[in-house]
Amino acid sequence: MNRKGFTLIELLIVVVIIGILAAIAIPKFANTKEKAYIASMKSDLRNLVTAEEAYFADSIKYTTAISCVNPAPAGSVSFCTTQGNTLGAVTTGVGTQAGWTTNVTNTNTSKSCGIYIGAVTPTAPASAASPEGAPVCQ
């Protein structure tokens, strides 16, 4: 008698091994979406820094007017956030040449990211202890 195939024990061992591998792998990928939301918020803040600095180079001042149309109306910066991200109010320091600060939130996470440039009181979660121009998330 020459039977071909796997025994029930062999199949059961394979299922157990797959279960063990899944138990190890799933926690490593559990917060992947959270990391992606944070990365999109940081990216938006870095892109806003670029837009504000370009505006500053032309106007010798920062602006608090952000517009999601291109070309931007006079006195504003053309900038659109990633889908799901919401930009907080952009505030400048004493005088529009001093600097600016803002934060961004995402509808899918409770975390937020903030940034500041220049001599301005940073918007949370950024703080005076955080590096200038670097997005800070918490």
Give the location of each predicted region:
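N-terminal single-pass transmembrane signal-anchor helix
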Residues: M1-F29, K33
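Conserved catalytic core of two-component sensor histidine kinases
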Residues: V15, K42, V49
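Aliphatic-rich helix starts adjacent to a transmembrane/signal segment
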Residues: K28-L45
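Intrinsic-disorder/low-complexity peptide segments enriched for small residues
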Residues: F6-E10, S43, N85
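Compositionally biased non-globular segments, especially hydrophobic aliphatic-rich helices
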Residues: E10, A39-K42, A129-P131
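Periplasmic/extracellular, small/polar-rich flexible segments of pilin-like filament-forming proteins
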Residues: T50-Q138
